[in-house]
C-alpha cells in the first residue's frame, strides 16, 4: 500500500476513532483489541454518519472505506473536519481519497479489486503502521505479524481439504438450513465472533446473529 503523506500529524492524540462500515470497520475492531494491552488512550470504532460530539483537535479519526465511496464514512469524515479533528484514511480511492487529498491529509491507498470483507489485512495493517508512526503503538507488534501469517496459511491449507477431517465441513453441515447464533465473551474473541457472523451473512447469504457475555446473561438468556 502507498501512503500519501500530507500535513504532519501530531505525535500524541488524546483519542482515536476509526470510522467505517461493514468489512472496512472490522480492521478497527481488531485494533481495538490491542487497546486492552498496548493502547493507553481511548480507541473507538464508529459505524454511522457522524462522530461523537466530544471529538476535537486532539482526536485522530481514521476513515476506512475500501471503495472510498461509502456514504456513512464520507459523512463521518465531513463531521470530523467540522469538529476540528485530525483526519486520515485507508481506501482504494474514490471520493474519500479525493477529499483527503484536497484537505492535504494523509491517505493510505490499498490494492483494489477485492470485496471489502476479503481485504481485512489491507485495512488492519495500515492502521497498525499508522499508530506506530505517531507513537501510539510499540513496534514490537511487527514481530507478531509473521507468526499470524504462518498460522493463517496453515489453517487455510487444512480448511481447504476435501476430506472428513476438515472441521469446516462438519460446521457447515451443522448450520445448513438453520439460523446460527454465535455467543462469545466480550474480550478478544468478541471481534472474531462478530467477523464470523458477518462472513456467514455475506458469503452464505443466510441469517446469523451474535451476542456476547456477560451482557446476554442479563436479557437474552431469558428468551431461552
Locations of regions flagged by a protein language model:
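Flexible, active-site-adjacent loop/turn segments at secondary-structure boundaries
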Residues: 2, 49, 53, 112, ...
Amino acid at each position: 500500500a502507498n501512503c500519501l503523506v500530507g500535513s504532519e500529524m501530531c505525535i500524541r492524540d488524546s483519542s482515536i476513532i476509526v470510522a467505517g462500515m461493514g468489512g472496512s470497520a472490522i480492521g478497527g475492531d481488531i485494533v481495538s483489541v490491542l487497546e486492552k494491552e498496548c493502547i493507553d488512550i481511548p480507541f473507538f470504532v464508529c459505524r454511522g454518519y457522524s462522530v461523537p460530539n466530544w471529538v476535537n483537535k486532539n482526536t485522530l479519526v481514521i476513515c476506512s472505506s475500501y471503495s472510498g465511496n461509502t456514504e456513512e464514512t464520507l459523512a463521518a469524515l465531513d463531521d470530523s473536519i467540522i469538529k476540528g479533528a485530525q483526519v486520515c484514511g485507508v481506501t482504494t480511492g474514490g471520493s474519500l481519497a479525493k477529499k483527503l487529498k484536497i484537505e492535504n491529509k494523509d491517505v493510505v491507498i490499498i490494492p483494489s479489486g477485492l470485496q471489502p470483507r476479503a481485504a481485512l489485512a489491507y485495512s488492519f495493517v495500515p492502521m497498525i503502521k499508522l499508530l506506530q508512526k505517531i507513537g501510539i503503538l510499540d513496534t514490537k507488534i511487527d514481530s507478531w505479524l509473521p507468526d499470524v501469517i504462518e498460522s493463517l496459511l496453515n489453517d487455510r491449507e487444512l480448511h481447504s481439504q476435501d476430506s472428513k477431517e476438515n472441521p469446516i465441513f462438519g460446521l457447515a453441515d451443522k448450520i445448513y438450513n438453520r439460523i446460527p447464533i454465535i455467543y462469545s465473551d466480550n474480550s478478544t474473541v468478541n471481534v472474531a465472533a462478530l467477523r464470523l457472523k458477518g462472513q456467514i451473512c455475506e458469503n452464505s447469504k443466510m441469517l446469523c446473529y451474535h451476542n456476547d457475555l456477560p451482557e446476554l446473561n442479563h436479557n437474552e438468556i431469558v428468551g431461552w
